[in-house]
Design a protein with these regions (language model features):
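Short, hydrophobic/aromatic-rich segments at coil-to-beta transitions
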Residues: 22-29, 57-64, 89-97, 120-121, ...
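Hydrophobic alpha-helical segments and helix pairs
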Residues: 77-129
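Hydrophobic/aromatic beta-strand elements that line small-molecule binding cavities or substrate pockets
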Residues: 46-52, 81-86, 109-113, 183, ...
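N-terminal cleavable signal peptides for secretion/export
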Residues: 12-82, 99-108, 165-166, 170-176
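Bacterial Sec-dependent N-terminal signal peptides
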Residues: 1-15
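Short beta-turn/strand-loop junction motif enriched in small, turn-promoting residues
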Residues: 35-37, 70-72, 188-191, 207-209
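Solvent-exposed helix/loop surface patches that form functional interfaces
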Residues: 23-25, 106-199
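Gly/Pro-enriched, hydrophobic low-complexity segments
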Residues: 78-80, 84-89, 202-230
Length: 230
């Protein structure tokens, strides 16, 4: 999408982006549901917070997303995920960590971003369930993001003029790999929240490339206003 080309390009200088959507101190909470035989069943909760902090002594945004399955859901499948990221105040990714306990497995994925000489340098780390560690370093030619960083940046995208099917392409990383990913605009819709309020929202699909095809990982909704609250 030409509209967003300045946000995700090969020039590291343009990895910077202006935040227009959130302020330090934002806290959001959610209920988690699972669709079981066409019935939505509450299985846990999630919370997301963003504050201005410091990373290696420099001002940065610190954002975390914590998901927890309920005691009843734990009888079938335990989920304890904690995602953390740091971004510069110009929205450049600096650090990402995902600690995931899913079932009887626990893994840690990390990504460290730096920009020596205006070039992107990426260091990845994974701690596997058996306790072994894997490290990898690379120099991507494009602005590269983690799951939380691209989510924060997307909130400041200007959707004016978007049409259904418009896509934003970008590389995404975790602790082991860098893969092509896409945000696809699905149009506007009205969402009724648990508090009974209805919100006019933009509908977006996050997809990752798998076996040559893009597969939807998650579909999310953000308010159709300047804050784009998820």
């Amino acid at each position: 999408i030409l509209l967003l080309a300045a946000g995700v390009t090969t020039s590291t200088a343009q990895c910077k982006f202006r935040n227009t959507a959130f302020k330090s101190g934002e806290y959001l909470s959610y209920n988690l549901y699972f669709n079981w035989k066409f019935v939505w069943v509450k299985v846990g909760n999630a919370s997301m917070s963003t504050v201005e902090s410091k990373y290696h002594g420099k001002p940065a945004y610190r954002s975390s997303l914590i998901t927890r399955s309920s005691a009843n859901a734990d009888k079938f499948f335990v989920m304890r995920d904690t995602l953390l990221c740091y971004n510069s105040l110009q929205m450049e990714p600096l650090y990402f960590r995902k600690g995931a306990r899913e079932g009887d497995r626990y893994t840690v994925d990390e990504a460290f971003f730096s920009y020596p000489g205006g070039k992107t340098h990426l260091k990845q780390h994974q701690q596997k369930n058996n306790g072994t560690h894997v490290w990898h370093e690379s120099k991507p030619t494009e602005c590269t993001f983690d799951m939380l960083s691209i989510f924060l940046r997307a909130r400041s995208f200007n959707p004016e003029g978007w049409k259904k099917g418009n896509r934003i392409h970008f590389p995404i990383t975790d602790g082991t790999k860098v893969i092509p990913a896409v945000l696809e605009y699905k149009g506007k819709t009205t969402v009724k929240a648990d508090n009974g309020h209805k919100y006019r929202c933009l509908q977006l699909s996050y997809m990752e490339k798998e076996n040559g095809k893009y597969k939807e990982i998650v579909r999310f909704y953000v308010t159709d206003d300047a804050n784009h609250v998820p």
